[in-house]
Amino acid sequence: HFIETTKQSNARKRNSLSMEKQITIEEIQNFEGKYPKQLWYLFTVEMWERFCFYGMRGVLTFFMVDQLLLKDDAANLQYGAIQAFVYAFTFIGGIFADKILGFKKSLFFGGIVMILGNLLIAFAPQQMFYYGIAFSIIGTGFFKPNISSMVGELYHEKDPRRDAGYGMFYAGINIGGLLGGALCIYLGKYHSWTLCFLAAAIVMVAGLITFLLTKKHLGPIGDSPLLAMPESKRKIREIAVYVGSLLSIPFIYTMVINTDYTDYFMYTIGIVAIGYFVFELLKLGEISLQKKLIAAFSFIFFYFLFNAIYEQSGGSLSLFAKDNLNSNLLGFTIDPNVVNNSSNTFFVIVL
């Protein structure tokens, strides 16, 4: 009886593995209902990552003024440099994912680096702050652009349900932003900064565990674009990306500390980004595809303009809230920076 049970168990395992191997992009995209099940997995992963990101973003300027004893204008400049590097490295991380790593490996690597960055700050907030920030910049650059790309691949190109899928996905972003923006500043100001940054690390661990447990359901979505290449050559390229990214951490640390250098880097990355866009545009050949890419670039341009204004909420508006807002509202005590960090995401969810 024991032998027979073992055989049946092994057979079930083989069948399960076989089913996992057989899942195709067509099977994923031909789902019934409004949302594919894979969307909920990515929703959860992104929710925890945005908790981490918006939690960190909401405390940066306040922490630099309160704990590192920087003046308001110096803290605001360094916050701007940090955010500039975050957006610059999403461009770089997206290229590496698209050309070498694939979305899955890029996302996992980015998550690990973000966790390390938060842990560095958690265990030595004053001493390791800028090193931890450098890790977080690299991690966000590899994580953020790639999970959104995987959501798009859950649908056929002309599937009318794609908009609803992205709407639900961005609801997860706002839920994570609401929770992280409120909880991290509360933990830091009223309990300990170690607990604040540790909470950000813990939720990222939860997000990565969710991803590891569910990535098999994504099938070929997010796999390396170099699967046809011999494994040894592919591994060399992947390791080069990992090592090169980590070796850039002292460079980022120096740029964030010395904000004058940041401008030169941003001018350089801006020229490189435009050059890369022109290169990809000419490579397409077909006019219809070129028009789509130009349209996408237009949206990206206005997205950057929007974020240049929106990110003031983590910098100058954070300082304004700290110094000018009343913490009493209708008899309730609410920290001004909890309101500043979370009001946008709250109203997006409500509306």
Stretches found by the model and what they are:
Residues 163-181, 188, 203:
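Glycine-rich segments within core transmembrane alpha-helices of 12-TM secondary carriers
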Residues 128-143:
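Hydrophobic core of transmembrane alpha-helices in multi-pass small-molecule transporters
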Residues 142-156:
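Intracellular juxtamembrane helix-capping segments at the cytosolic ends
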Residues 58-76, 315-337:
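Short amphipathic helix-loop junctions that connect adjacent transmembrane helices
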Residues 80-97, 342, 346-351:
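Central cavity-lining transmembrane alpha-helices of secondary-active solute carriers
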Residues 15, 19-37, 157, 185-318, ...:
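Intracellular loop-helix junctions on the cytosolic face of multi-pass helical membrane proteins
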Residues 112-129:
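C-terminal ends and interior cores of transmembrane alpha-helices
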